[in-house]
Amino acid sequence: MKKNLKKNRLLENYYKLPKGQRIQLKKYLCILAVAFLLFLLFLNLLHSCGWEGTDTPEMSETSPQHIPVVQKLKNVWITDAEADRITIFCDGEKETFFLEAETEGSDSVPAPEQMREQLADVELTDELVSAVVLKTDKFTGRVLSANENGIEIEGRGRIPLAEDYKGYRLYRELTMCTFADLTFGYANADFVWEDGVICGILLAREANMEDIRVLIKASDYADILHTEVILTADSDFLLQYGSGENIQEELFPKGDKITIDMDSDYFVGERISIVPAVLTGRIQLLSVNRSQGTPSYRGHIELLRTAEGIAVVNELPLEEYLFSVVPSEMPSSYPLEALKAQAICARTYAYGHMLRAGYPRYGAHVDDSTSYQVYNNITEADSTTTAVKETYGQMIFTDEGTVADTYYYSTSCGVGTTASIWKTAEAQMLDYLKSSRLRPSPENPVQTDDGAVATGSTEITAETIAEELSEEESFRDFITQTHAEDYEAQEGWYRWIYTVKEIDVDRILETLKNRYEANGKLILTLKDGDYSSQSIKNFSKVTDITIVKRGPGGVADELVIATDKGTYKIISEYNIRAVLCDGVTRVVRQDGSEVSMPSLLPSAFFVIEPSHDKKNMIGYNIIGGGFGHGVGMSQNGAKNMALQGLGAEQILNFFYEGCEICSGQ
């Protein structure tokens, strides 16, 4: 009651004040309130910075302590790894994280080659990788049933799923998956387990995917057979030997090295098979050397003993084969659309040879060299693998519905040629491989820096290019100039010079004999006014060399070499490139770089200028352009088309006229 009376008196006194004083009093009270709030805010700020008052001066002098933010990513898929970073795929997204400096050389983060394409727990400290725990304990088996409680595997029973398990579909486009995506009755997945539960599902392959069989050549591609094979694997692996019903198996732990020679006790039957215990396991051929070093192979390896040596055959899914073909055939730094065009070409080419095996004796469709497609010479790359996955199953078909012959080569000189250069009956039917000008507007007249190139009064157009450049004078005008509008005008191989100061007669003689043994119909001798196929006689002098016929686009098609003992006609671009290469002279490219050519000239798009001393030829100068045979897709042409905005389908439609791109599944 007294409090209320006191309050009422204060209010009465307040209202007795003049209006101006009341307003002034309100202002003072507001200022005091704001000052009090600022004081409280200041105290709170000091407290948050760790200041506890003047009684503890040592704390006020200490720098604020950083509390690290630690994040643990469970069961993520590592797609790529480098010395300073890793790229992971988790919850449908790819993300790259850099490594903490302290992890370098420590055991907390494995080496990059150990982390690539592995399941792992990744620890991040302030968004930097501080630890990686790989989960490499995997198995595979036929799936009989699956639900949220676990997965039933043939021979293993039901295995529980971890609460935080993750599933990844590795084929086609990399995506997430669950137990519901498993195919019952098939063993097309690996399972990663930890502490008795499944923590990862790796859908490695699509069921019933067709396989390709690749003959692996010896080191440096010196031979198709091996005298000894040394191998190991990055997972446990089976060695199967015997034949028929007497197949026996031995299980080896990952990292164990096995040596097989011609006298090995394992050769009870004809073949020995080495099969990784998991689908994502890889076999290393320690006795084989490639540009990448020691190659490792997906799929499984078979060893076949023959009288001459051991044939090594790698069987694996076609799509996985392409993972190692595309980076070996085209630099992984090229634009994605060019890589996709290369992937479609490579897939079509490989499938064509799966229909007609190149090595029926060894049970192989192709080998791993330039004789077919270079395979596993360069390590797989994320960009090229992406190109393969984004074009999954796509191939090129002719207008008749057959698989196209998708030949390709490195670089054009500004024009391509046709398959007629190979002098086979089949080549005559490949009418979709045309001789075309490689520039943005091929339908327009060919332009040089000084105007249109012409023979007489006829301009060279896309329609007349094959015929016009077959004429010596026209081709000479073309190849001795550069054409700024050409797609590859800035490429090193677009123009080159090869100057032989002293002719190597013995080398020419030896090469002529070798090429005659390979195909006598293409190395002819002049006798009684006609050329015919007969053995090459020795000669000691060369008196002249002349190109007597050019093919579509101006490619050298027939070459005549006159000697002191006879005159010879060399037919086909390959034979001509071989005969004129002395193995010593270096090619000088248009950018000034020099390149050794041990066995072949870069291309047969060239003109030759002999130098004579009285009656004999002492040397020759070659002005040429391009690298490769010139048939089908130019890879550097595709690169520059992609840089100018063309897509993979547009690129392929340019090089394979009238063909269609569709799924081969």
Spans of features found by a protein language model:
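Conserved, single-site charged/polar hotspot
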Residues: 2-665
